């Protein structure tokens, strides 16, 4: 069972109680802090759509600390990030691995950040299937298509040649925040929000 902190906001004579995620959403902040699955994707997509409707001109900020997760769920978030009108600023705090790294790289160019001690990791999709030989073959072909799709998305957002992405994703490929900047996954390593 997880405990969600609450925040009490006072304005004049009234008090308003928010769960922490709702309060962050009020400031146009979305936090992805778990493995990415269908439930997480649906919540993030709903938040993106809500924030676009609320003000299509103001940036949306996505903070990421995730080991990755389901490719289909991550691609649903990715497509929505590309679909909405507001710029999406992405921030890696802790880790952005696998599908979470794709989302980090998919932020608006110039607005992709990593904190100094965060790590990112790219690799090929992982899948396992058993059953009849024909079904195994169908799933193997599908995972290879997903591998090509994800490699092309990473190449598009990082500016790296597809051949380099293909080579680097063959195995787990870890990067520090500075290495992620050199790779093109983030634009800047930041240590403070203060200006």
Curated annotation (Swiss-Prot):
The keyword Hydrolase applies. It holds the Pfam family CLP_protease. Its main location: cytoplasm. One of its GO terms (biological process) is protein quality control for misfolded or incompletely synthesized proteins. It is an enzyme of class 3 (hydrolase). GO terms for cellular component: cytoplasm; endopeptidase Clp complex. It comes from the Bacteria. GO terms for molecular function: ATP-dependent peptidase activity; ATPase binding; serine-type endopeptidase activity. Keywords: Cytoplasm, Hydrolase, Protease, Serine protease. It catalyses: Hydrolysis of proteins to small peptides in the presence of ATP and magnesium. alpha-casein is the usual test substrate. In the absence of ATP, only oligopeptides shorter than five residues are hydrolyzed (such as succinyl-Leu-Tyr-|-NHMec, and Leu-Tyr-Leu-|-Tyr-Trp, in which cleavage of the -Tyr-|-Leu- and -Tyr-|-Trp bonds also occurs). The keyword Magnesium does not apply. Its EC number is 3.4.21.92. The active site is at 98 (nucleophile), 123. It is found in: Cytoplasm. InterPro entries: ClpP, ClpP/crotonase-like_dom_sf, ClpP/TepA, ClpP_His_AS. Belongs to the peptidase S14 family. Cleaves peptides in various proteins in a process that requires ATP hydrolysis. Has a chymotrypsin-like activity. Plays a major role in the degradation of misfolded proteins. NCBIfam families: clpP, PRK00277.1, PRK12553.1. This is ATP-dependent Clp protease proteolytic subunit. It comes from Thermodesulfovibrio yellowstonii (strain ATCC 51303 / DSM 11347 / YP87). The lineage of its organism: Bacteria, Pseudomonadati, Nitrospirota, Thermodesulfovibrionia, Thermodesulfovibrionales. The gene is clpP.
């Amino acid at each position: 069972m997880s405990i969600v902190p609450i925040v009490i906001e006072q304005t004049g004579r009234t008090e308003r109680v928010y769960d922490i995620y709702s309060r962050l959403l009020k400031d146009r902040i979305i936090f992805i802090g778990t493995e990415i699955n269908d439930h997480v994707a649906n919540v993030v997509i709903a938040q993106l759509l809500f924030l676009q409707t609320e003000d299509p001109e103001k940036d949306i900020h996505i903070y990421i600390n995730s080991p990755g997760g389901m490719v289909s769920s991550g691609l649903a978030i990715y497509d929505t990030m590309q679909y909405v009108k507001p710029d999406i600023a992405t921030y890696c705090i802790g880790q952005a691995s696998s599908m979470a790294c794709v989302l980090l790289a998919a932020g608006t160019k110039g607005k992709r950040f990593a904190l100094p001690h965060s790590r990112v990791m790219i690799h090929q999709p992982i899948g396992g299937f058993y059953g009849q030989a024909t079904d195994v073959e169908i799933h193997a072909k599908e995972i290879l298509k997903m591998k090509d799709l994800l490699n092309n998305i990473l190449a598009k957002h990082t500016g790296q040649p597809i051949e380099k992405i293909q080579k680097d994703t063959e195995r787990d490929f870890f990067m520090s925040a500075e290495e992620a900047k050199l790779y093109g996954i983030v634009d800047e390593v930041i240590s403070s929000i203060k200006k």
